[in-house]
Amino acid sequence: MCIRDSLMRADHTGITMVNIGVGPANAKTITDHIAVLRPHAWLMLGHCAGLRNTQELGDYVLGHAYVREDHVLDEELPLWVPIPALAEIQVALEQAVADVTQLPRSDLKRVLRTGTVASTDNRNWELLPYPGPEQRFSQSRAVALDMESATIAANGFRFRVPYGTLLCVSDKPLHGEIKLPGMANHFYRERVNQHLRIGIRALEILREQGPDKLHSRKLRSFAEVAFQ
């Protein structure tokens, strides 16, 4: 999902939703092309595996750091380059969760956890022998795992497009809660609509603030001029 110029609004700040499918290769290819349009921001909304036993199915994860085991951008953006969280996006996403769920701030932490998101290119990571990715994810203090978020954030950093990640826990494979067909259908009915409304609300908040606030200095090097 991203903000980009749109023929549907006079102020050219429409919202475009893009289904990127599954996997970091898709995420890279699509964000490579979207970046050419110079969107004001893009958000990753998707499902993830919850890595903490205290998480419940349907909880949200606001990504503030990334473990990059997706491997698709290792040459363009080496792993030693940190991918920082952008305060403007983080605040908008947290406010959007509060607005849509109508939960008081004291209860928000019950359904929204901020933490590290690990992204892998191996769909069967939990079947690998220990120690493997499970140990690395534990060492990184990751709270969620998916296949695309780190790629989208890294490409946002690479192309100077403000980025953010809000995931929804759909299964907990390390704790015996896997996504079975019946459970998945119920989960999708209950959560997908709310998740999308949160993403749209976050973009509306960013739009109300204006694009100038989104042009984060975190995305520019010390020897680089500002550009859109």
Regions found by a protein language model. Name each.
Residues 150-187:
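Zn-dependent metallopeptidase/amidohydrolase metal-coordination segment
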Residues 173-227:
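His/Asp/Glu-rich mid-to-C-terminal helical/loop segments that flank catalytic regions of hydrolases
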Residues 40-41, 143, 162:
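Short acidic/polar active-site loop segments enriched in Thr and Asp
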Residues 80-139:
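Active-site rim beta-loop-alpha module in soluble metabolic enzymes
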Residues 4-92:
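Metabolite-binding pocket within alpha/beta catalytic cores that recognizes anionic/polar moieties
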Residues 92-104, 155, 198-206:
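Generic non-transmembrane alpha-helical segments
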Residues 25-28, 147-152:
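Short glycine/serine/threonine-rich phosphate/pyrophosphate-binding segments
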